[in-house]
């Protein structure tokens, strides 16, 4: 990679190298603009569900969106970006009693339901989110978090063959991610408890596993979902091919 001698703060990520999100975020120049040249134009559709599949679109997306966690460029350890957390766990053999006010989305009856008594989980992670404004000026809030969990559960569960919330690529992936989620309990306007059946000797890895976040406003995800359910587009490339519709892109 070639870097102008007047550019400082280039980060050589041990995994991603110089083109990681840390370089454009950390770089300093004598100008107000930072010019970055790429070899090819992006190839993946511009949607955060099953688009952004190539290196170049991922590099752009990594600059203009925030994850809830990320990996340290030199150590590979998980660190917080959009939330602080506190992990409670006693290992694989001991369980935590989940409070009955905790909820989970039920895709069969299409509503949030409280968990039953005597519900247990391996770990509890309390997330204190760092909300700010979306690019359109709207303030982030708990609706974005809850809708993200709804979306993952709804699309990760195929009720029957006529289920419209099914994608050939995304549904199997979402189904795997929801297997260990037990419940979510909203504490206040920016704090939730997430209960999971997962353990790791590093508590930050438990937090990353339990993390619930949305890179876009919930309204945007809902609009994309409606377009897909109406049969106009598909979240994934294979879904678009099988249904003979366009691969959903928010900018084309």
Task: Name the predicted role of every residue range.
Residues 1-252:
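The feature preferentially marks the first beta-strand/turn patch immediately downstream
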């Amino acid at each position: 990679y070639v870097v102008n001698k007047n550019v400082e703060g280039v980060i050589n990520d041990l995994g991603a190298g110089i083109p990681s999100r840390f370089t454009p975020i950390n770089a300093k120049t004598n100008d107000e603009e930072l010019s970055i040249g790429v070899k090819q134009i992006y190839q993946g559709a511009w949607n955060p569900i099953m688009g952004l599949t190539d290196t170049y679109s991922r590099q752009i997306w990594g600059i203009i969106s925030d994850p809830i966690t990320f990996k340290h460029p030199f150590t590979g350890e998980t660190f917080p970006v959009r939330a602080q957390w506190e992990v409670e766990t006693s290992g694989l053999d001991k369980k935590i009693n989940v409070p009955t006010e905790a909820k989970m989305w039920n895709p069969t009856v299409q509503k949030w339901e409280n968990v039953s008594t005597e519900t247990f989980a391996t770990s509890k992670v309390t997330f204190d989110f760092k909300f700010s404004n979306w690019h359109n000026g709207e303030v982030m809030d708990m609706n974005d978090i809850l809708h993200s969990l709804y979306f993952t559960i709804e699309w990760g569960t195929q009720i029957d063959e006529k289920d419209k919330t099914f994608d050939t690529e995304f549904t199997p992936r979402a189904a795997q991610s929801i297997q260990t989620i037990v419940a979510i309990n909203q504490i206040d306007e920016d704090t939730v408890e997430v209960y999971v059946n997962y353990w790791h000797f590093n508590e930050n890895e438990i937090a990353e596993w339990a993390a619930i976040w949305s890179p876009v406003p919930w309204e945007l995800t809902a609009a994309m979902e409606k377009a897909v359910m109406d049969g106009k587009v598909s979240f994934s490339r294979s879904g678009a091919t099988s249904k003979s519709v366009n691969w959903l892109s928010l900018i084309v």
